[in-house]
Amino acid sequence: MPTINQLVRKGRVSKVETSKSPALNKGYNSFKKEHTNVSSPQKRGVCTRVGTMTPKKPNSALRKYARVRLTNGIEVTAYIPGIGHNLQEHSVVLIRGGRVKDLPGVRYHIVRGALDTAGVENRAQGRSKYGTKRPKKK
């Protein structure tokens, strides 16, 4: 434990909390051509690459992902949730925060049912998370 004199000289330094989704905390002013510190819950971007990757050790699958260039100029890797998707290069997507635990470097999710991303077909439960409309009653 420090002495009173050591605390008077140096003092306690509080920890700085870093964001888990830093690309959502940057904006871009295209008129002034400068980056701004504007936080937003989602951001729009254009897919530059769509593909699959394999998860970390105990799991085995082909997880769908997209490399997305956001409106603030930052390029991030985002996970495509749900079964099947219609994304390809140059698709305009909406990104939200939220990492995928077994995919290293994937800190963002693509919002299904927004912009060019279609909702998941034939989904009955948890539809709001996958952008699926309510099925018609027969």
UniProtKB/Swiss-Prot annotation:
Domain of life the protein comes from: Bacteria
GO BP, one annotated term: translation
CC annotations in GO: small ribosomal subunit
InterPro entries assigned: NA-bd_OB-fold (IPR012340), Ribosomal_uS12 (IPR006032), Ribosomal_uS12_bac (IPR005679)
CDD domains, alphabetized: Ribosomal_S12 (cd03368)
Pfam family membership, one: Ribosom_S12_S23
GO molecular function terms noted in the UniProt entry: rRNA binding; structural constituent of ribosome; tRNA binding
Record text on subunit structure and interactions: Part of the 30S ribosomal subunit. Contacts proteins S8 and S17. May interact with IF1 in the 30S initiation complex.
Family that this chain belongs to: Belongs to the universal ribosomal protein uS12 family.
The protein's name in its UniProt record: Small ribosomal subunit protein uS12
Annotated source species: Bacillus licheniformis (strain ATCC 14580 / DSM 13 / JCM 2505 / CCUG 7422 / NBRC 12200 / NCIMB 9375 / NCTC 10341 / NRRL NRS-1264 / Gibson 46)
Organism phylogeny: Bacteria, Bacillati, Bacillota, Bacilli, Bacillales
Originating gene: rpsL
